[in-house]
Amino acid sequence: MKSLYDICAPAKLNLFLHITGRRSDGYHLLQSVFMLIDWCDTLHFDLRVDGQISREDLATPLPFDDLVVRAARALKAASGSPLGVHVGIEKCIPAQAGMGGGSSDAASTLLALNHLWRLNFSLEKLISIGLQLGADVPFFLGGHNAWVEGIGEKMDPVVLPSGRFLVVKPVEGLETRLIFSDPALKRDSETAIISGFAANAFGFGRNDLQSVAQRLCPGVTQALEWLASRGLSGRMTGSGSAVFAQTLQDVDLRGAPSGFQVRLCKSLDVHPLVGWAVSDRLSVGSA
């Protein structure tokens, strides 16, 4: 195998996001449900036998903070593989949107290179590498919609009803760090239970980060008001700045504020690459 083309990296929406506390080390405790949607980046991988890692759209030296580059380097370091890769990306998921685009790209890179380099790493091994890259990377590696708790490390798969969602990304983005460090952030939400969520999956709870985001980024409020003008009740995903609303019928996408990205998306039951890495637990159970 010398190449892998058209590898999908889907975005996610946070159906709700509650902050339930803050640890002594500064990390926030949260509850959320992460749902995959069909707004995707597309990645292409060409094998390099010289051991080098390169990106079609980036000159050398490669930026240290690029998640795709970091994922490839982390997998190479963990495996000791002498092989390299040339990566191309068709970037569609907006940055600083709360949709997990960078983390999803990193996860798809780990899964693809596990095949291209013939490493046969287990899913658990890839997740341990993904944890070094970002809190959302393990979710995308897991391949299923999930109930998420703790600082984001506790995940349980959930089955969600299918849905269509109008997603709106303002021109401005938001830095996660600024949202979580804001003194006005609500950090004392009561602990939710999954049965309460299941009774109203697409309307449960709220996003505790939203009020802070609206103050820092007026575009969030503009996007929510535009959804409301279409008769839709919206909320922010993640730390923003994208917002979304479930829609049961076709919506006129015209008239959005200038420069805003608007897309009608469908939920995904599973990640397009689910099964690309085998779980250790599955291997033991089927032996």
Curated annotation (Swiss-Prot):
It catalyses: 4-CDP-2-C-methyl-D-erythritol + ATP = 4-CDP-2-C-methyl-D-erythritol 2-phosphate + ADP + H(+). It comes from the Bacteria. The active site is at K12, D136. One of its GO terms (molecular function) is ATP binding. Disulfide bonds: none annotated. GO terms for biological process: isopentenyl diphosphate biosynthetic process, methylerythritol 4-phosphate pathway; terpenoid biosynthetic process. Pathway: Isoprenoid biosynthesis; isopentenyl diphosphate biosynthesis via DXP pathway; isopentenyl diphosphate from 1-deoxy-D-xylulose 5-phosphate: step 3/6. ATP binds at P94, A95, Q96, A97, G98, M99, G100, G101, G102, S103, S104. Its EC number is 2.7.1.148. InterPro entries: GHMP_kinase_C_dom, GHMP_kinase_C_sf, GHMP_kinase_N_dom, IspE, Ribosomal_Su5_D2-typ_SF, Ribsml_uS5_D2-typ_fold_subgr. Keywords: ATP-binding, Isoprene biosynthesis, Kinase, Nucleotide-binding, Transferase. SUPFAM superfamilies: GHMP Kinase, C-terminal domain (SSF55060), Ribosomal protein S5 domain 2-like (SSF54211). Catalyzes the phosphorylation of the position 2 hydroxy group of 4-diphosphocytidyl-2C-methyl-D-erythritol. Belongs to the GHMP kinase family. IspE subfamily. This is 4-diphosphocytidyl-2-C-methyl-D-erythritol kinase.
